[in-house]
């Protein structure tokens, strides 16, 4: 745990008592603050009280007594409307911050030279974050991994010289971190997502940009320039005097890092030098993973990791669950079917990465639809032998696929998985792929994408003749 001493002797309100909120309560109390905890969920209030915290309805308390409101990232700060706690805090002149802000203040106060790597982007954050941590551990670094990827940042070990924190950050977390100042900041990409919480894509992109704009003096901003928002951000941040590493998998850069399916290259003016090979690494298959690997490579090279250790670490990286996870193979008379769990693909842009990585696809898609549908995936339709549509999006997706891709409305994973497996086995293809890449949120049928992917894995492993990869 990281004790938060910056509010010692003061009263702090914490709203939202899930994993990061409860961790904030513990860290603030350990640092000497008085914590008043609140949540709309009564069970979480009870849990906090049992853990020894004062719980109260913050509506009934004088807000001028609070030094800060620590807000969980899931609570609206601005859109579609500020949460009532935010309005109360603003009326009383109380700052509204999140758990990563508490970390940044502790690091600045106690270990300002301790390396801190922060990663954001619409897609690829978790894989890139996990890969950076893996590479640094391979290099022998004392590495703490957390943030949006799982472990609450304040539950990690405290910053100190020689210890690096590798932290995935969502746009919600960045919004609550005004002092964000990583040693290395990474902005992978920006595509339309979370507009319900940010109002416009321009505001969403501006929030993402703050992570790389805030890199501390002498640090490195690594920015994907394959979208217009990244290109503009790189130019602005470079003009502000920061060290910018431009990253691309679509075209050349003058200074920066590029990648394709085979290798990662460092570019310095007219000179391009290979720093690592990617060919044959199954956990980093696809051009989207080449981008993730390029970002991770740029980060660890900036911290002093050698190309030799980088290559070893890339080859030993196991990948992440629910992100193009190869969960099994089924050997048939005519071919071998590969089953791939890409449940994390909760929008069309993410699903495009998986569809581009395979041929002869038996595609399981659908769930709670997002704006834009799947028309943007039309260039990949020739790769799809048949689609199996589930959830609320089934009828909408069927209308898009009509006359272009054979489909059936399966409604559930329980129906889709055996149907896709049967059709793949009977297709006569040498290497058919049953791919769960939903292009939708999971909330119509599952609490989160992890449970959706876990259910897919269970259904696949229950099929006759399926062996683990």
UniProtKB/Swiss-Prot annotation:
Gene Ontology MF terms: ATP binding; tetrahydrofolylpolyglutamate synthase activity; UDP-N-acetylmuramoylalanine-D-glutamate ligase activity
UniProt catalytic activity: UDP-N-acetyl-alpha-D-muramoyl-L-alanine + D-glutamate + ATP = UDP-N-acetyl-alpha-D-muramoyl-L-alanyl-D-glutamate + ADP + phosphate + H(+)
Pathway stated in the Swiss-Prot or TrEMBL entry: Cell wall biogenesis; peptidoglycan biosynthesis
GO annotation, cellular component aspect: cytoplasm
Record's keyword terms, sorted: ATP-binding, Cell cycle, Cell division, Cell shape, Cell wall biogenesis/degradation, Cytoplasm, Ligase, Nucleotide-binding, Peptidoglycan synthesis
Main location per the UniProt record: cytoplasm
InterPro entries documented for this protein: Folylpolyglutamate_synth_CS (IPR018109), Mur-like_cat_sf (IPR036565), Mur_ligase_C (IPR004101), Mur_ligase_C_dom_sf (IPR036615), Mur_ligase_cen (IPR013221), MurD (IPR005762)
UniProt: ATP binding residues: 121-127
Domain of life: Bacteria
Class of the enzyme per the UniProt entry, highest EC level: ligase
EC number(s) recorded for this UniProt protein: 6.3.2.9
Pfam families, alphabetized: Mur_ligase_C, Mur_ligase_M
Localization: Cytoplasm
Gene Ontology annotations of biological process type: cell division; cell wall organization; peptidoglycan biosynthetic process; regulation of cell shape
Family stated for the protein in its record: Belongs to the MurCDEF family.
Function of the protein: Cell wall formation. Catalyzes the addition of glutamate to the nucleotide precursor UDP-N-acetylmuramoyl-L-alanine (UMA).
Protein's UniProt name: UDP-N-acetylmuramoylalanine--D-glutamate ligase
UniProt source species: Rhodopseudomonas palustris (strain ATCC BAA-98 / CGA009)
Gene name per UniProt: murD
């Amino acid at each position: 745990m990281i004790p938060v001493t910056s509010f010692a002797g003061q009263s702090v309100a914490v709203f939202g008592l899930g994993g990061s909120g409860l961790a904030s309560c513990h860290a603030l109390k350990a640092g000497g603050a008085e914590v008043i905890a609140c949540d709309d969920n009564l069970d979480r209030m009870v849990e906090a009280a049992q853990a020894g915290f004062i719980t109260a309805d913050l509506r009934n308390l004088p807000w001028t007594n609070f030094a800060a409101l620590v807000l969980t990232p899931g609570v609206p700060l601005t859109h579609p409307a500020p949460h009532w706690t935010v309005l109360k805090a603003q009326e009383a002149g109380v700052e509204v911050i999140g758990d990563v802000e508490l970390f940044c203040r502790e690091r600045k106060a106690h270990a300002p030279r301790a390396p801190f790597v922060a990663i954001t982007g619409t897609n690829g954050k978790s894989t890139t974050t996990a890969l950076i941590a893996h590479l640094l551990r391979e290099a022998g670094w004392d590495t703490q991994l957390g943030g949006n990827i799982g472990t609450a940042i304040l539950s990690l070990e405290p910053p100190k010289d020689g210890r690096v924190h590798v932290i995935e950050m969502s746009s919600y977390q960045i919004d609550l971190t005004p002092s964000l100042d990583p040693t290395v900041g990474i902005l992978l990409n920006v595509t339309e997502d979370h507009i319900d919480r940010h109002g416009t894509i321009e505001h969403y992109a501006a929030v993402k940009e703050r992570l790389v704009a805030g890199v501390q003096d002498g640090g490195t901003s690594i920015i994907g320039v394959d979208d217009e928002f990244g290109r503009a951000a790189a130019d602005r941040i470079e003009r502000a005097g920061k060290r910018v590493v431009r990253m691309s998998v679509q075209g050349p850069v003058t200074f920066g890092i590029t990648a394709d399916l085979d290798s990662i290259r460092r570019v310095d003016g007219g000179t391009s030098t290979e720093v690592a090979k990617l060919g044959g690494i199954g956990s980093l298959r696809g051009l989207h993973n080449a981008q993730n690997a390029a970002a991770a490579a740029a980060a660890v090279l900036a911290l002093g990791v050698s190309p030799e250790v980088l290559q070893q670490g890339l080859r030993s990286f196991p990948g992440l669950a629910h992100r193009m996870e190869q969960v099994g193979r089924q050997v048939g008379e005519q071919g071998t079917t590969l089953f791939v769990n890409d449940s994390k693909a909760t929008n069309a842009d993410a699903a495009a990465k998986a569809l581009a990585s395979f041929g002869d696809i038996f595609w399981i898609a659908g769930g709670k639809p997002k704006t834009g549908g799947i028309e943007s995936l039309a260039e990949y339709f020739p790769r799809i032998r048949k689609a199996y549509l589930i959830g609320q999006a089934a009828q909408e997706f069927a209308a898009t696929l009509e006359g272009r891709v054979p489909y059936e409305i399966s409604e559930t994973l329980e129906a889709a998985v055996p149907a896709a497996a049967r059709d793949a086995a009977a297709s006569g293809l040498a290497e058919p792929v049953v791919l769960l890449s939903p292009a939708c949120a999971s909330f119509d049928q599952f609490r989160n994408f992890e449970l959706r992917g876990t259910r897919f894995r269970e259904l696949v492993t229950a099929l006759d003749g399926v062996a683990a990869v």
